[in-house]
């Protein structure tokens, strides 16, 4: 068991869901379901197993999980994931290309059938069901409750089921279409979970039979009610309208966004897409940008419907996605979006929790890191990251790790003062010079290692300042991210070269944590500065409203939206002169009326 799996096992939720075991290449090799993900997944890595399971466990290099709302949902999601991914360790059904549905034919005398093929305009379909046994059990229950035609005999002949009270085709004439339409409508209501009327009717018949001392018939009605109860747990993962749709949910925290997309095809949740990335603007804006990029990828086919969270403007999504955009307001469809959002929250929290785990081993990690770089053990590490959007409101941040743990009292923020426009190299030079000129001239504690977020350009800029401008001797390394904004490579040495670092090592885990922390700190500061600047710039033309009063307003109202909703009295309560407060209030009022 590698370190990544050890950390992930500690973070599993006590929830029902599906888990996906992966090999070193990232290929899904097994899909399973669990009433309790924490207990089930942990069981693979504890105790002894049979030969087949031992072989599976030996190939597991990573795993993912999807939280569901019930064990029924987990079961149905499992069969969809197996069908879609065909993992080599899953037992394949003999007819694994399709799953059974219950069909109501559109014949003059409708019949209930079990089928594995869906044909358009050929009847109504309900399902899919996880196996033929389940579908058969449901059909048996329907046959006992609803008197559909059971066989292909001519309607002028009495069949066996007529004598059981389970077929009325012989007694209902061809012209009584309303009867059959009503029966079909009752089945649709029943299979969609609206079964209270049926249960009330059966309960009345049971009581009547019992009153008449027809105890066998009363027991039959009792069994029917019990059978219905076993079907009442409705699952949200499957959609009964067989519609193709993508379901989006997202969650943001600590400067990061996680977006989860559930792919529903023919009513089945067949796959999900998970992506985590830092966001720089408002969450809704960056979510829209992500959706646009998502569908520009030719691998992602556009479905008939796209479900989005209610905080998102559907007209903006409709402008970039040629599909029906839906913001579900109630019921199962809203719960599907909520489920995607819940999984986004769980995934993002897992990312943060992974970075917090196993700090006791970081002492060994920093010692090994020093050995890899050929330097003394880097007890104190200072890491830097720049943050700006096309050069606006440029800032930088520094985080400090001592003995592998964050020392937040030593964190520092920098506003870029000498650089105009988006120039990461010049910004890095400025920040490094400001920080280490103080270290040199004020006798502050110097780090054992400097890490900059970036590639060769950033490393060379920082090293040039340290060595040539300040005459210091502090090692400088660089951390590069891949196109998914994940820690990818460590650069060090002269000339710079990639340091071979095992992905599952404690050293890599530590560097990943440092890079994520400095990035989080930088973009959080950048967002604060941008918000403050935007707030101030909108008030620049108000006479008598200087920097101190703007700061006072920002501290009290937090945002322009809140300020625009403030009354004149609330503004004056801050000690702002009446004439200035009135000018500000008039400006805000006229702005809101435009």
From Swiss-Prot:
Keywords: Cytoplasm, DNA damage, DNA excision, DNA repair, Excision nuclease, SOS response. It is found in: Cytoplasm. It holds the Pfam family UvrC_RNaseH. GO terms for molecular function: DNA binding; excinuclease ABC activity. Residues 196-231 form the UVR domain. Residues 14-91 form the GIY-YIG domain. SUPFAM superfamilies: C-terminal UvrC-binding domain of UvrB (SSF46600), GIY-YIG endonuclease (SSF82771), RuvA domain 2-like (SSF47781). GO terms for cellular component: cytoplasm; excinuclease repair complex. GO terms for biological process: nucleotide-excision repair; SOS response. Interacts with UvrB in an incision complex. PANTHER family: UVRABC SYSTEM PROTEIN C (PTHR30562:SF1), UVRC/OXIDOREDUCTASE (PTHR30562). Belongs to the UvrC family. NCBIfam families: uvrC (TIGR00194). The UvrABC repair system catalyzes the recognition and processing of DNA lesions. UvrC both incises the 5' and 3' sides of the lesion. The N-terminal half is responsible for the 3' incision and the C-terminal half is responsible for the 5' incision. This is UvrABC system protein C. It comes from Streptococcus equi subsp. equi (strain 4047). The lineage of its organism: Bacteria, Bacillati, Bacillota, Bacilli, Lactobacillales.
